[in-house]
Design a protein with these regions (language model features):
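Short beta-strand "wing" residues that participate in macromolecule-binding interfaces
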Residues: 57
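Amphipathic alpha-helical dimerization/coiled-coil segments
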Residues: 78-119
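Short, cationic-aromatic polyanion-contact patches
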Residues: 3-7, 60-79
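Short helix-to-turn junction characteristic of helix-turn-helix DNA-binding domains
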Residues: 15-19
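Pre-recognition alpha-helix immediately N-terminal to the DNA-recognition helix
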Residues: 9-14, 26
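Short, hydrophobic-biased segments on the C-terminal half of alpha helices
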Residues: 43-47
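Short acidic, hydrophobic short linear motifs in intrinsically disordered regions
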Residues: 21-31
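Glycine-centered, phosphate/nucleic-acid-interacting loop/turn motifs that mediate DNA/RNA or nucleotide
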Residues: 53
Length: 122
């Protein structure tokens, strides 16, 4: 798994922001407010994301409504898992990662580890 391309990332960010499934036309309207982009470009990118398994779609009349198949957090976790898998020495990768996080992120990590251990401190 690789990260999203530039337009894929922009589209996924917008889809994640929507509480309800969104059509290509709706998303194109949002995106074209800030940049020149063809409707067909948005449509083909969303179709590609669907074929890759990142978007689910349901037919509504002549159009599809798209929603993410995974949350933004699940996607981020998959990227982190991939980085561990291809990064070489797992302990060193984690060590370098921990050197780069701030106090708030460190506390969040401790909290998650504690919950996973049944409330015992990490």
């Amino acid at each position: 798994m690789r990260g999203f391309g530039e337009l894929e990332a922009v589209i996924m960010d917008r889809v994640w922001e929507h509480a309800e499934p969104v059509t290509v036309r709706e998303l194109h309207g949002e995106l074209s407010a800030g940049r020149v982009i063809a409707y067909t470009t948005v449509m083909s990118t969303m179709d590609n994301l669907h074929r890759k398994g990142w978007l689910e779609r349901v037919k509504e009349g002549k159009a599809y409504r798209y929603r993410p198949s995974a949350s933004r957090e699940e996607y981020s976790a998959r990227l982190m898992r991939e980085a561990l898998a291809v990064g070489g020495d797992t302990e060193m990768v984690l060590s370098h990662f921990l050197d780069q996080i701030d106090g708030e992120e460190s506390e969040a990590l401790r909290s998650v580890l504690s919950k996973l251990r049944g409330g015992r401190p990490a």
